[in-house]
Amino acid sequence: KGKIRQIVSADIDFNAKVLRKRMEERFQSYDFKHGDQLYMSFRSPVNGYLAVYLYDGQEMVYCLLPYIRQEDGCFSIKRNEEYILFSPDGSSSDIVDEYNLTASRDKEVNLIYIIFSPNKFTKALDDSSGEELPRSLDYKSFQKWLVKCRNKDVEMRVQRKTVKITR
């Protein structure tokens, strides 16, 4: 004899990989050297929306996706399509931002937040920090935004990837 209960939400099993220097999945890595190019592969079984943020481990969070030139504040994902993010070789080459990871100390640890939902959501309110850096906000404001989004959207999923950068 079993019990019946309502499924509130099923996990969306998306696939996100951090790639170092090359745009192929075999170059998945969490260990970077100062100046290495950052790419990310992403695939989802459902249509949805994606945002990617990088926390510098100190006080700032940088919005890597949606791209700076995207005016609508969200990045759309089509189900079962493979995306290589931060690469100029894709269909969105006119709006892509490319990133090199840098370290101001001998060793740094950063967190990459990969945020996906089948429901439309808008990126956090952030500020432009100049041409060399992506838009940013402080860590406390980012956490407040993320908690608010997750409370409103039970289907939102967040993966955190730890990235080490050495000089």
Ranges and model annotations:
Residues 1-167:
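Secretory-pathway glycoprotein ectodomains that are cysteine- and/or Ser/Thr/Pro-rich
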